[in-house]
């Protein structure tokens, strides 16, 4: 279903409700530059890096698009998805069944879920929706619970410290969204709805947070303008 949520004036903050869930796959593919390509890259790396029957948890799994892709790459993976949106999980369950993917879903706040014993954790554009004051402790929790040599994949929207560059990146990104079929009005409406909901860090801040949590290796494996995918190894 095509994302047309912001064609009309919105008077509430952004939330992952039934309306958003119904168009989420279209929304993220048109809103995050090279989303499918970056997920494909992350999936390829995990397929080559993780042991047989590795346990993977996607924190903020939305409609399970990434988990389903992992299932097709490595059917032996044990896959788990957590999301606090029941509407998202309803679609995720339906999609996973259609693909024959066995995925254990849980409707829960990711800050409170049990993370022990996983070989890999996924945060695909999830951390940016968590209050900044809680992020460091949550990333540290992920690190401490990952198995030895565990991997964290973390995709995030970024901000730039240089004000001129930051303004240029915003303009470039808005031009990108218009090329994806969004009107200037829709872009402005969504930006307003996301104020104080989506709060990005800089690349440096994200790197430092991962290092402070204890990760030995922190690399950016994909980047386009103000979007990046981090890979961190325990």
From Swiss-Prot:
S-adenosyl-L-methionine binds at residues 35, 60-62, 83-84, 109-110, 124, 191. InterPro entries: CmoA, Methyltransf_25, SAM-dependent_MTases_sf. It catalyses: prephenate + S-adenosyl-L-methionine = carboxy-S-adenosyl-L-methionine + 3-phenylpyruvate + H2O. GO terms for molecular function: carboxyl- or carbamoyltransferase activity; S-adenosyl-L-methionine binding. Its EC number is 2.1.3.-. Transmembrane segments: none annotated. It is an enzyme of class 2 (transferase). Pfam families: Methyltransf_25. The keyword RNA-binding does not apply. Keywords: S-adenosyl-L-methionine, Transferase. GO terms for biological process: tRNA wobble uridine modification. Catalyzes the conversion of S-adenosyl-L-methionine (SAM) to carboxy-S-adenosyl-L-methionine (Cx-SAM). HAMAP family: Cx_SAM_synthase. NCBIfam families: carboxy-S-adenosyl-L-methionine synthase CmoA. Homodimer. Belongs to the class I-like SAM-binding methyltransferase superfamily. Cx-SAM synthase family. This is Carboxy-S-adenosyl-L-methionine synthase. The gene is cmoA.
């Amino acid at each position: 279903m095509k994302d047309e949520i912001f064609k009309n004036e919105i008077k509430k903050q952004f939330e992952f409700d039934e309306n958003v869930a119904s168009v989420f796959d279209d929304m993220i593919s048109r809103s995050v530059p090279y989303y499918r390509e970056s997920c494909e890259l992350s999936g390829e790396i995990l397929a080559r890096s993780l042991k047989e029957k590795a346990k993977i948890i996607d924190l903020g799994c939305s409609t399970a698009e990434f988990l389903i892709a992992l299932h097709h790459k490595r059917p032996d993976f044990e896959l788990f998805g957590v999301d606090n949106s029941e509407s998202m999980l309803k679609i995720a369950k339906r999609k996973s069944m259609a693909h024959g993917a066995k995925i254990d879903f849980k409707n829960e706040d990711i800050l409170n879920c049990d993370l022990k014993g996983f070989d890999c954790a996924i945060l695909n554009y999830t951390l940016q929706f968590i209050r900044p004051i809680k992020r460091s402790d949550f990333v540290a929790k992920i690190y401490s619970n990952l198995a030895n040599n565990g991997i964290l994949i973390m995709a995030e929207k970024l901000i730039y410290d240089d004000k001129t560059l930051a303004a240029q990146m915003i303009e470039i990104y808005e031009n990108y969204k218009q090329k994806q079929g969004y009107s200037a009005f829709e872009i402005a409406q969504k930006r307003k709805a996301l104020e104080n909901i989506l709060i990005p860090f800089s690349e440096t801040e994200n790197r430092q947070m991962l290092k402070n949590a204890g990760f030995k290796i922190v690399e950016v494996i994909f980047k386009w303008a103000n979007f990046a995918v981090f890979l961190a190894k325990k």
